[in-house]
């Protein structure tokens, strides 16, 4: 995308639409009812089985979204638009120690969250609703200072960010972040199937995402309710 477009049309949303406003608009444009096609459900279930061994090798976490072109989400593939669902999958796996069924998550977000038939992925607030229905505490925040405070106190996080804070045309990505021994690790962040990058705090981690061009939109802190 040209520099002129980056600073003009491409920069309009990142520079002039607030994070919380953007997320709420995204949610309004997303689906909250629907019935999954039985044949698609069966195909996704069969396809997921082919990924299970590789997920187990990655500590129960999905790090390789581009490999999921065999699973459908709306009118597109999980390789194209599955990052929000994969972030939820990784959060559940990390917090419970049990691998969830990705095909069932696809079905759930197809009923509440899928945006423009999957072409815009999943509305992040649908992830908040889903996690709360499962009994987790899920707190969304939109300002950098609130995000840094949340990241300091929470061991499981979902981050939504612009791949380029000056260009909406570079799209948005969503990742799970784990915290162990005081260090943050990003998952499914485009590291060639590996976990990472890693950092001491959220600001440092964001600075390492998307070639240093990332800009935060929303952070969800997830905890088990006592």
Regions found by a protein language model. Name each.
Residues 1-116:
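Active-site-adjacent structural segments surrounding the nucleophilic cysteine of cysteine proteases
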Residues 11-15, 21-27, 178-226:
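Noncatalytic regulatory segments and standalone regulatory/sensor domains
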Residues 72-78, 127, 131, 206-210:
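Non-catalytic, solvent-exposed segments at the cell envelope interface
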Residues 84-87, 123-127, 143, 147:
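Stable alpha-helical elements in mature extracytoplasmic
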Residues 85, 120-124, 199, 213:
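A structural signal for well-ordered alpha-helical scaffolds and beta->alpha junctions
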Residues 114-140:
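Mid-length scaffold segments of soluble, non-membrane domains
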Residues 139-186:
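Active-site-adjacent substructure of cysteine-protease-like catalytic cores
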């Amino acid at each position: 995308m040209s520099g002129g477009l980056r600073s003009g049309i491409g920069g309009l949303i990142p520079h002039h639409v607030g994070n919380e406003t953007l997320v709420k608009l995204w949610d309004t444009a997303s689906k909250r009812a629907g019935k999954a096609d039985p044949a698609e459900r069966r195909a996704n279930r069969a396809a997921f089985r082919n990924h299970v061994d590789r997920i187990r090798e990655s500590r129960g976490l999905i790090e390789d979204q581009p490999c999921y072109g065999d699973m459908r989400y709306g009118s597109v593939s999980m390789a194209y638009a599955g990052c929000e669902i994969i972030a939820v999958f990784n959060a559940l796996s990390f917090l419970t120690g049990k691998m969830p069924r990705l095909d069932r998550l696809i079905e759930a977000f197809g009923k509440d969250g899928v945006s423009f038939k999957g072409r815009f992925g999943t509305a992040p607030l649908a992830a908040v609703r889903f996690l709360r229905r499962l009994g987790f505490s899920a707190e969304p925040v939109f300002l950098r200072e609130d995000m840094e405070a949340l990241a300091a106190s929470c061991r499981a996080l979902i981050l939504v960010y612009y791949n380029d804070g000056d260009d909406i045309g570079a799209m948005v990505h969503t990742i799970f972040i784990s915290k162990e021994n005081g260090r943050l690790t990003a998952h499914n962040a485009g590291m060639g199937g590996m976990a990472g990058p890693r950092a001491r705090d959220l600001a440092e981690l964001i600075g390492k995402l998307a070639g240093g061009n990332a800009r935060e939109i929303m952070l969800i802190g997830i905890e088990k309710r006592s």
